Amino acid sequence: MHERYVPADVEAAAQSDWRAADAYRSKEDANRKKFYCVSMLPYPSGKLHMGHVRNYTINDVMYRYLRMNGYNTLMPMGWDAFGMPAENAAMANGVPPAQWTYDNIAYMKKQMQSMGLAIDWSREVTTCKPDYYKWNQWLFLKMLEKGIAYKKTGTVNWDPVDQTVLANEQVIDGRGWRSGALVEKREIPMYYMRITQYADELLNDLDGLGWPERVKIMQQNWIGKSFGVNFGFPYELDGEKKLLRVFTTRADTIMGVTFCAIAAEHPLAARLAQDKPELQAFIDECKRGGVAEADIATMEKKGVATGFSVSHPLTGAPVEVWIGNYVLMSYGEGAVMGVPAHDERDFAFAKKYGLPIRQVIAVEGETYSTDAWQEWYGDKTRAVCVNSGKYDGLAYDAAVDAIAADLKAGGFGDKQITYRLRDWGISRQRYWGTPIPIIHCPSCGDVPVPEQDLPVVLPEDLVPDGTGNPLAKSDAFLNCACPKCGAAAKRETDTMDTFVDSAWYFSRYAAPDAQTMVDARTDYWMPMDQYIGGIEHAILHLLYSRFWAKVMRDLGLVAFGEPAKNLLTQGMVLNETFYREDAAGKKTWYNPADVTVSFDDKGRPVGAVLKADGQPVVLGGIEKMSKSKNNGVDPQMLIDHYGADTARLFTMFAAPPEQQLEWSGAGVDGASRFLRRVWAFGFANREALAVRAPFDVAQLAEADKTLRREIHGVLKQADFDYQRLQYNTVVSAAMKMLNAIEGAKGATPAVLRETYGVLLRVLYPVVPHVTYELWKALGYADEFGPLLDAPWPKVDEAALEQAEIELVLQINGKVRGALKVAKDASREAIEAAAVADEMFAKFAEGKPAKKIIVVPGRLVNVVV
């Protein structure tokens, strides 16, 4: 054992032992409790960031603690390796996405290994490899057979210059990110999955999950179950009688309809524009907008009158039809009823275009005015119908019932439950993704690739150039024979949404070498006992993975319908930001490592200068670490300088896992100093700590009893904190233990050995390298076995017993001191001790005690 703690040497030695023993390979064991904990697999972007370090350390701590407690634990890792960033990098660097991806994986894997994570690398999954995505294709075909997957036209962003489809994030101010061309909306055939078929189950099953409440609420809102009325406004066109259908949750306001708005893609819009160039021009303008719901919500609401009217289903009055850029064809019926008096968006639209505003609900004590929108205009809890004929005086529920009944009687509509959730469109007009296993034959149409021909392998040598999908230009990939008739045919060039890849990887970890999609091992490990990832995945990834599990269950592949029992959403890692702004308002951001900060006497930053030139920079405040703000900390530099254990210790100590973590260089230094103290104590006392002598608890001296009482008391709290995932207070507990052990005067070697051994085990899940090496060097491994599987220390309740307790002493309600009494002292004895105490004599000023109040175990108050 070396005198000085050298993290690089300590960590290399520990990791060498773990590799030699294949220490983290997990096997199924039906006789043991299992614990399967998974961090959301990373995208191989090139380097780990501190968010990764925090996530994986949380997982690792959980794994090690539970393994010491007898669980059969598994912590796997993989790579979410398909996706657009690889294509962008390929275009920038002129290399195939595969090369960029595999190089990044190799580097990031090396970084993870340097962190000492308890990963079972034999289960590694890479989603861009054919042995993985084969099963995406296989399940897609099964879903196609069952009608869960299907084909229909969908709206996409089309770049007319690059001749390619753009993701929503590639549309900037209505233009293509590369070409700058005005983006168009296009309808193209795409594949969808019927997630809506599972809407109620996805909603109801949230109740049984140990997930954060805000994640559940986000999913509930995304699924968006609504109770309303679906009905139509009758009209006649080209000699045909039809209904313009809408869905509303506010049927009670139907008498206030003054217009209807339809989407630019609505069939009625196309028909009405046939002989009206101004309508067609507006439709074309709408098609150049984004297709994302978020874009629609924030853009200016525009409309154009068609000059065509439909009839109100209950009054027969004409209702003018408008085309609105805010109406999405993909949501509801592609048409909405306009009730300006009681819908804020309709109110603004009506004011802009001078449309009638008709009040049809009222709230007692409130006065309606069309001058400005007020919150109560949309109230349905206190409102009653007015100006609504036979429905006047009815509250919301009664009005909806009566109006729905009348609409049904007239053949116009009825009550309906609807969902905000839409079927999952999985087609992506991109190269770097799972090929959709469909062949297009001129004679047979769309033909599924036969199961024996799977996987359809994605060529890895193509380099995208931004002008269309490279697969469509690759004859070797594109051209094939029809499996049905043998004629010349072409492969589907769309690939699958990368959310497909991440929808089930945790099931494949359980059986990575299976010749089927999953096998019995999957039902042993799944569902995950703990899933860990960022709140940004609360909706799409987590919702799709829940849907995928239910589909796999219904196809008889697995026994579970939910992939994760518990979810932890770790907080973001924050850091200071610094910048300079030029005359044009452009900001240049500087990394905190390149800046010298000055602080006031309370430690608050008050100024900063750039190290390179000594000139001031602006303090931009604390924000999430990001490339855009250049405020990240390179984990590799941290590990190289301080060691992985220091990085792990700081990230666990700085904040509870679910809360934001503010980066602190001083905090990292403090973590490093603490580990040096742990090592230094072990080295300085190595001979005493090597003594393995039994001791009789009853015969221990007071110094030993005091130390054991403190250590076992802190151990009890630390164990509780491990169970509730409060790792920051676990580290606090370890610090208290070290303080107690260092300050123990007169403790015997045997008790020092016991208590230091407790400290090493409490710290081990957080800082495994230094504790593992100390455990081995000081002979604990000879007694208990390697620290990896050493039993978790048990709290000695007898050690917590005290002969004396300390009570707060108050005189006339003011704290004046402390009173030591026997643990089982009677009330009379406590009262006598209180009046005999020197503090009573000092503050009573010769007055006798009138009354003595004793709160058992806490305080005694003498009233004079």
From Swiss-Prot:
Stored InterPro entries: aa-tRNA-synth_I_CS, aa-tRNA-synth_Ia, Leu-tRNA-ligase, Leu_tRNA-synth_edit, M/V/L/I-tRNA-synth_anticd-bd, Methionyl/Leucyl_tRNA_Synth, Rossmann-like_a/b/a_fold, tRNAsynth_Ia_anticodon-bd
Enzyme class, UniProt record, top EC level: ligase
Protein's name according to its UniProt entry: Leucine--tRNA ligase
One cellular component (GO) term of this entry: cytosol
GO BP terms: leucyl-tRNA aminoacylation
Motif ('KMSKS' region): 624-628
PROSITE patterns noted in UniProt: AA_TRNA_LIGASE_I
Compartment(s) where it occurs, according to its Swiss-Prot or TrEMBL record: Cytoplasm
Motif position, 'HIGH' region: 42-52
Organism: Burkholderia thailandensis (strain ATCC 700388 / DSM 13276 / CCUG 48851 / CIP 106301 / E264)
Keywords: Aminoacyl-tRNA synthetase, ATP-binding, Cytoplasm, Ligase, Nucleotide-binding, Protein biosynthesis
Gene3D superfamilies on file: 2.20.28.290, 3.10.20.590, HUPs, Isoleucyl-tRNA Synthetase, Domain 1, Valyl/Leucyl/Isoleucyl-tRNA synthetase, editing domain
Binding-site residues, ATP: K627
Matches recorded under Pfam families: Anticodon_1, tRNA-synt_1, tRNA-synt_1_2, tRNA-synt_1g
Domain of life per record: Bacteria
One Gene Ontology MF term: ATP binding
Similarity comment text for this entry: Belongs to the class-I aminoacyl-tRNA synthetase family.
Key word Chaperone present: no
Reactions accelerated catalytically: tRNA(Leu) + L-leucine + ATP = L-leucyl-tRNA(Leu) + AMP + diphosphate
Listed EC numbers: 6.1.1.4
SUPFAM superfamilies: Anticodon-binding domain of a subclass of class I aminoacyl-tRNA synthetases, Nucleotidylyl transferase, ValRS/IleRS/LeuRS editing domain
